[in-house]
């Protein structure tokens, strides 16, 4: 304000895009000085005044899991396009949980601590990205607006973003049957896994619609790990 020879209120009008309250010449001078000194607004202070921070918290079960990085990238790009910043909190649970995905509930304390950290910077909302597509009902309790991605919850009030395992699997199988015939090898996840069951149901529905019987010798189940998939391929190719 001092460098521009104007009041703090006038600078605030320009920073908050209320240019109709400032003459074009003054607004241009203020913007030039802002660029010259590389001024960065204090988002926390702004949040304290307005109760809105324009910051989204993204919490990942584990950033190293193959699909998570792409989801975070998509969230970040969309947030930036809409004037939001993103704070990432990676729980790093892959090596602790391994394939015992339901053991995530053992780490509710860790999740709660990270939520408190995000609350401290007054995020407007949190996106929780799972590392496995399964039900996490009751995992997180918070008053912050929360969206689940790549995991589900049976709570009717929870907001979640995902996809239809059964329908996608059905369409993929229909395409393969049309292009390559009926001898298709199927490698699925654990039999007790809900998403694996949904995907297999889609495969079976596609076969039924085509009036073709599945060759059960070409059907194997694994545990989501690369080594398991390799072994399933070997068993099918014997």
Regions found by a protein language model. Give the residues of each.
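N-terminal helix-turn-helix DNA-binding module of bacterial transcription factors
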Residues: 1-53
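Aromatic/hydrophobic pocket-lining residues that form π-stacking "cages" and hydrophobic walls in ligand
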Residues: 30, 75, 203
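Alpha-helical recognition/docking segments in bacterial nutrient-uptake
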Residues: 51-174, 178
């Amino acid at each position: 304000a001092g460098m521009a020879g104007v009041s703090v209120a006038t600078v605030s009008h320009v920073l908050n895009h209320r240019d109709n309250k400032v003459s074009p010449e003054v607004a241009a001078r203020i913007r030039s000085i802002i660029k010259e000194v590389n001024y960065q607004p204090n988002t926390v202070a702004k949040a304290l005044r307005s109760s809105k921070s324009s910051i989204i918290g993204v919490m990942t079960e584990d950033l190293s899991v193959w699909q998570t990085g792409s989801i975070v990238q998509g969230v970040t790009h969309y947030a930036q396009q809409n004037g939001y910043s993103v704070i990432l909190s990676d729980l790093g649970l892959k090596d602790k949980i391994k394939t015992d995905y339901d053991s995530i509930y053992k780490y509710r304390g860790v999740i709660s601590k990270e939520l408190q950290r995000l609350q401290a910077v007054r995020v407007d909302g949190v996106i929780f990205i799972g590392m496995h597509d399964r039900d996490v009902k009751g995992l997180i309790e918070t008053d912050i607006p929360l969206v689940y991605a790549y995991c589900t919850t049976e709570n009717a009030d929870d907001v979640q973003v995902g996809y239809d395992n059964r329908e996608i699997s059905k369409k993929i199988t229909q395409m393969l049957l049309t292009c390559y015939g009926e001898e298709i090898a199927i490698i699925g996840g654990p039999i007790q896994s809900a998403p694996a069951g949904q995907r297999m149901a889609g495969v079976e529905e596609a076969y039924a619609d085509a009036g073709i019987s599945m060759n059960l010798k070409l059907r194997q189940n694994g545990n989501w790990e690369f080594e398991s998939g390799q072994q399933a391929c070997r068993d099918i190719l014997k």
